[in-house]
């Protein structure tokens, strides 16, 4: 049996182990397409700001092709470094594309104000064609979908600080799109707006340079459909993280946005570890969880073997991502979701609509949290040096806290209900007026006589015998009553019974000194 268990553990490790790079064959390369990336050819701030302005307009042009749009985005993403060309060449290793760098300098002879650097060759016309300044219709389209503030005509500046603020504002909006461009593009707008508000409050971005929704949709769609662009963005994030010492302000902002990008699409795996294993509830000892716990252990080892690209496996379309889906450990995932819903309010909006979701183990997780509330782990208490008296105090406080939390979360919801009091007079009852009022009083008096003589079991028959059959009860229901006499009869019967009961309560209340008054507290008790 021991040999079988060792073989099983070895099998599980090798099953999820990534293939080892070996063999005589070379790297497999696909059919590449060329991407032209414009970069500044000098260190002038005017050149960079003008290039940024032209690229933003170019991306807003709906007629731009996909590879050209990718090149423009890569050019903007690399503008914050001192040498964009060196950065692109260093971090780019894509088997699907071939990047061509074009240095851009200022020019007074072109409509775009820029030209491609060359030795003795006039490239103004080619630059105008690239930046869509060759015809007025395309120029007008390039302005569509730009900034929300229409008073901003251009973003050309000569001040390095102002350029960094404008560039950082645009880059923040682009990088935030990567967080949900692949995993949840339909619900991305709300989270992107929250990130924008956060960075606006922190003065990291300038609110006036908020880009229009259509421009952001174009960029988000391109990020979602172009793997090469996502590879470049992930490689740039990893390169920034590996940089020692202090980083530029824009680089630090990119690292901050990375906290929303990292582990995108891996929520099931991460939350199962957080709520299913790290909470260390005794339910982990169930035999049903034994196999899935072994699977999770193998996946955690595989995650570590993948290295620094593991948190980005979904954005990088790594085929190994399917092993980390919740379908590989459905029972443990369902249990962890139940634990998470009870522990964190933010888990309440999570979508559990999966075919492998097991409600029984979900409820198991909920019950484990509820019944374990206030208990102190003996192992953890011994490690922290907590005495038995302190543990009892913590348990008592935690129990009261949990009860308060439950009462606030699922407390009784009281409706707007009015109660009939024993001391309420006839004048305070709803009046119908005229003949109807007299008929109701007469019927109610006869109902009291019938109640005294025959008891409550036969009082309803006496009330039904004196029911006015042809009189509508309310002006709002008059048309309905005239169309259906039976409905009118039933409505009148119900109202008369209610008023008769009110009269009986009045008589019973007159025999006692203190009338019974009903309120919400009596009902809850």
Curated annotation (Swiss-Prot):
Phosphorylation at Thr-279 is required for the formation of the nucleocapsid. Residues 1-375 are annotated as: RNA packaging and organization of the helical nucleocapsid. Residues 1-403 are annotated as: Ncore. Forms the helical nucleocapsid (NC) in a ratio of 1 N per 6 ribonucleotides, protecting the genome from nucleases. The nucleocapsid (NC) has a helical structure with either 12.35 or 11.64 N per turn, approximately 20 nm in diameter, with a hollow central cavity approximately 5 nm in diameter. The encapsidated genomic RNA serves as template for transcription and replication; encapsidation by N is coupled to RNA synthesis. Forms the encapsidation complex with the phosphoprotein protein P. Before encapsidation, the newly synthesized free N protein, so-called N0, is chaperoned by P. It comes from Measles virus (strain Edmonston-AIK-C vaccine) (MeV). The modification Phosphothreonine is found at residue 279. Belongs to the paramyxoviruses nucleocapsid family. It is found in: Virion; Host cytoplasm; Host nucleus. This is Nucleoprotein. Keywords: Capsid protein, Helical capsid protein, Host cytoplasm, Host nucleus, Host-virus interaction, Phosphoprotein, Ribonucleoprotein, RNA-binding, Viral nucleoprotein, Virion. It comes from the Viruses. A motif (Nuclear export signal) lies at residues 425-440. Residues 477-505 are annotated as: Interaction with the phosphoprotein. GO terms for molecular function: RNA binding; structural molecule activity. Residues 433-452 have a biased composition (Basic and acidic residues). Residues 418-525 are annotated as: Disordered. A motif (Nuclear localization signal) lies at residues 70-77.
